[in-house]
Amino acid sequence: MSWLNVKHAMDLSPWIRIPLMWPEPGLEDVEEAQTPEAWARYFAEGLWEDFAPEKPEPGEVDLLTDILLMYALRAPAAFPDFEVFLHLPHPREIPLPAYVDLVEIEEGEDRETALRDLTHADASYAVEPPIVEDFHSPHLGAGLRVLRYYQDEDSNEVHVGLRYAWRYEKGTEAADVLIILADPDAGRILKALDDVDEFARTVRISADEEADTWTSS
């Protein structure tokens, strides 16, 4: 059985992965992976160190710690069981969550229909026709990238959604791969688009025998 491999996305500097649980299996000896509080503090301090000689103002490390902790506790609930990454190119910016997972293929559903459904390419609720583009991954092949504007049901604000999807088929195994982002700030999504494209191209499906590499490095 193959598995969703997001390990290579962890090497991209604007991205921080939120562990799936605390502590995460295989990371029991990693101090920052034991609790969300330890994780948030570790990355808050590390991000500011990465931006030296720019110095944080008094309280900014604590503020970023609190922000990261909030995302660690709340973001995974939006799409349970999805891998969650935060795009954070600067410690003074607000994180942008990205969700990644495998989606079971419904029986008889063809590739094009499935990918358009997953990406909301034909969403009737969009305030204007979604921008649908082919998107190639070196690991997953041809897929779709869809950018859409829609009205949030709770706030009535116009939000921006960005989704990517591919179909993976190898032997008897098949699944769809889905990436989801959304934000009320269109500029935040558009500014991050190149980074998100790069992130999307690192996602892959790996064989069982490669699973140990997840915990060994």
Locations of regions flagged by a protein language model:
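N-terminal targeting sequences that direct proteins away from the cytosol to non-cytosolic compartments
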Residues: 1-160, 168-176, 181-217
